[in-house]
UniProtKB/Swiss-Prot annotation:
Reaction(s) catalysed (UniProt annotation): NAD(+) + (deoxyribonucleotide)n-3'-hydroxyl + 5'-phospho-(deoxyribonucleotide)m = (deoxyribonucleotide)n+m + AMP + beta-nicotinamide D-nucleotide
Listed name of the protein: DNA ligase
Cysteine pairings via disulfide bonds: none
CDD domains cross-referenced by the UniProt entry: BRCT_DNA_ligase_like, LIGANc
Gene name of this polypeptide: ligA
Keyword field contains Ligase: yes
Domain BRCT: 600-679
Family per record: Belongs to the NAD-dependent DNA ligase family. LigA subfamily.
EC nos: 6.5.1.2
Taxonomy, superkingdom: Bacteria
PROSITE patterns for the chain: BRCT (PS50172), DNA_LIGASE_N1 (PS01055), DNA_LIGASE_N2 (PS01056)
Length: 679
């Protein structure tokens, strides 16, 4: 037994190191080296070992990322050094004033600045001892924050163990919610009739202060680190012992990256103030291209010795300033207010606006969320309104310019019947959402089909909203399973669907039968079940029938599946109509199992490295990647001597030329089909 335990201990530590390495490649460097399926196998092996030998479980094990039971509150934590706020600069003049103050305090010295993006999130502190995360906290009042260690452990970019055993290190960073995750979260909350988050920052803050870590884990947060509050770096970082600490802030950022932290790559060093100012002003427009929200840039004196001499006021350091972007708003007119019916029956009022340019795009619509918000803001048809993008993402009406009213404006009220089917509408107690009561409502059906066919679900090319509207109107489709019964003669008469398009659509529908179980679960449109939850459920149950028979008690014990998701799943599969649709899908031949090769860890392409270049005729880039990974292969973004195959479509790029130079096997699309068995 002792030998078994020792072997298990060695293997568990080996697995932890390997998983930590792949977390670093994926979440920090954005260079994954293995497939999701291969990563899941490593995690499952570690979970089995720790379950068999509970004494092996460590606080830094990757299996401990999702916390246990909800807590009653958060304990207070005192920071090792104050987490000060930053003084603000709102224009070029104030930036130059900051530089003047720095140079006056450091007469005759050369000053270099580091400029970093100011992430719009929640400031947090992470404390490590001997390379192990022991505590994480919010900023709080700067001296004392709240202990949110268990919640921060669920953020995949937070290392539980550093790549080197640094004796003591307090790291500062910004937790945030990516724009895409924020949009998905609010869409789900709107469908559920829940209060929406105003912006990604509020969403991140609310997510990290959840008493239940499983809810935090489901929110897909991320974190960039930007500095340290305290550091005993030791010989783990400086092995020669000639110095014991970094000397520049830019060096700190590089060291943090080497230790396993995610550092924002958009930082620059400047010697000349004019270039620094130009760089800051240039980000005002560029920020909208980023996948996360930023509200400015932070300018810091690079030399740590100079930082120490400059010191700080009671509120903020003298060696740093935050350049804040001016809020981008525009005035436009509400032309009309119309109601959209979602796939769960929620009636969402939307303002039709006179088109206006805002935050890099033309805005012609803005969601008004629900009737309560319209009443609260007193929004009327014909009003001139101030609009902005919440978190630079979602257009919203900020305020009504009531002084501009002429008397011709019209008040608006939520219709008492569904605008699509005429059925009655209801508003559940405690909810802001109004819902259509008709399960067979054409608008609900249409939105559900759009979701089912979408790229992240069953990915049926050519089946867009216009075609779906015609199919529903003609009575050809009453649920998603009916798509698989469509015939050529059903499609040809439809507008804009000639013989060729009809054949292509039928082929796309047929191809979708082979999509993964995770995609099918997501496509079903179960309330609160997003892409990540669908993958977790697929990996856990391995079959749709297994998920259908799951109890609520069983579901809540799955990491990241909380009570709300569990209740929604049980409710969905308890519905007789839903079960009939699934039965039709099974009879049509739609895949309801996980890939056997993924489950058993093998496949005809096992271990082979592929690079994709050019445009494939019959595969999207994502489809080709999923096919390769399902057969055991993996995708690389660049060609090297370790590459086994380059799949070349039309107009291949430089990767094709490099493959020729290195003698790497090049496959055209037909050869790729033969290799993967998709003839």
């Amino acid at each position: 037994m002792t030998q078994d335990l020792e072997r298990a201990r060695e293997r568990a530590e080996e697995l932890r190191r390997e998983i930590e390495h792949h977390n670093y490649l994926y979440y920090v460097l954005d260079r994954p080296a293995i497939t999701d399926a291969q990563y899941d196998r490593l995690m499952r092996e570690l979970e089995r070992l720790e379950k068999q030998f509970p004494a092996l479980v460590t606080p830094y094990s990757p299996t401990q990322r999702v916390g246990g039971r909800p807590r009653e509150g958060f304990a207070a934590v005192r920071h090792l050094s104050p987490m000060l706020s930053l003084a603000n600069a709102f224009d070029e003049r104030e930036l130059r004033d900051f530089d003047r103050r720095v140079r006056q305090a450091l007469p005759g010295e050369q000053v270099r600045y580091v400029v970093e993006l100011k992430i719009d999130g929640l400031a947090v502190s992470l404390y490590y001892e001997n390379g192990i995360l022991v505590r994480g906290a919010t900023r709080g009042d700067g001296d004392t924050g709240e202990d949110i260690t268990e919640n921060l452990k669920t953020v995949r970019s937070v290392p539980l163990r550093l790549r080197r055993p640094v004796p003591a290190l307090e790291v500062r960073g910004e937790a945030f919610m990516p724009k895409e995750a924020f949009s998905r979260l609010n869409e789900g909350r709107e469908e559920a009739g829940e209060t929406l988050f105003a912006n990604p920052r509020n969403a991140a803050a609310g997510s990290l202060r959840q008493l239940d870590p499983k809810i935090t884990a489901s929110r897909q947060l991320d974190l960039f680190v930007y500095g340290t509050g305290y550091g005993e770096w030791g010989r783990a970082v400086f092995p020669d012992g000639e110095r014991t600490a970094p000397q520049e802030h830019a060096e700190v950022l590089e060291l943090l990256k080497e230790l396993g932290f995610k550092v924002n790559p958009e930082y620059r060093l400047f010697d000349r103030l004019d270039e620094l100012v130009e760089y800051c002003l240039g980000w005002q427009a560029r920020r909208f291209e980023l996948p996360y929200a930023v509200d400015g840039l932070v300018i810091k004196v690079n030399s740590l010795a100079q930082q120490e001499r400059l010191g700080a006021t009671m509120k903020s350091p003298r060696w740093a300033v935050a350049y804040k972007f001016p809020p981008e708003q525009a005035v436009t007119k509400v032309k009309d207010i119309f109601v959209r019916v979602g796939r769960t029956g929620v009636l969402t009022p939307t303002a039709e606006l006179e088109p206006v340019r805002l935050a890099g795009t033309t805005v012609s619509r803005a969601t008004l969320h629900n009737e309560d918000i319209i009443r609260e803001k007193d929004i009327r048809i014909g009003d001139k309104v101030l609009v902005q993008k919440a978190g630079d993402i979602i257009p919203e009406v900020v305020a009504v310019l009531k002084e501009e009213r002429t008397g011709a404006e019209k008040a608006w009220a939520m219709p008492g019947r569904c605008p699509s089917c005429g059925a009655g509408v209801v508003r559940a107690e405690g909810e802001a959402a109004v819902r259509c009561t008709n399960m067979a409502c054409p608008a609900r059906l249409q939105e559900g089909l759009i979701h089912f066919a979408s790229r992240d679900a069953m990915d049926i090319a050519g089946l867009g909203p216009a075609v779906i509207a015609q199919l529903v109107s003609a009575g050809l489709v009453g649920d998603p399973a009916d798509l698989y019964a469509l015939r050529y003669e059903d499609l040809v008469p439809l507008e804009r669907l000639g013989p060729k398009s009809a054949r292509n659509l039928l082929e796309a529908i047929e191809a979708s039968k082979g999509r993964s179980l995770a995609r099918l679960i997501f496509a079903l449109g179960i309330r609160h079940v997003g892409e990540r939850a669908a993958k977790i459920l697929a990996n856990h149950y391995q079959s749709l029938s297994g998920l259908m028979s799951a109890t609520q008690e069983e579901l809540v014990n799955i990491p990241e599946i909380g009570p709300k998701i569990a209740a929604s799943i049980v409710e969905f599969f308890s519905n007789e109509q839903n079960r009939k649709v699934i039965d039709k899908l099974v009879k049509a031949g739609v895949n309801t199992l996980t890939e056997k090769v993924i489950r058993e860890g093998g496949g005809p392409l096992n271990g082979k490295v592929f690079v994709l270049t050019g445009v494939l005729k019959d595969f999207s880039r994502q489809q080709a990647q999923e096919l390769i990974e399902s057969l055991g292969g993996r995708i690389s973004s660049s060609v090297s001597r370790n590459t086994d195959f380059v799949v070349a479509g039309e107009n291949p790029g430089s990767k094709y030329e490099k493959a020729l130079t290195l003698g790497v096997k090049i496959l055209d699309e037909n050869e790729f089909r033969e290799l993967t068995g998709r003839k």
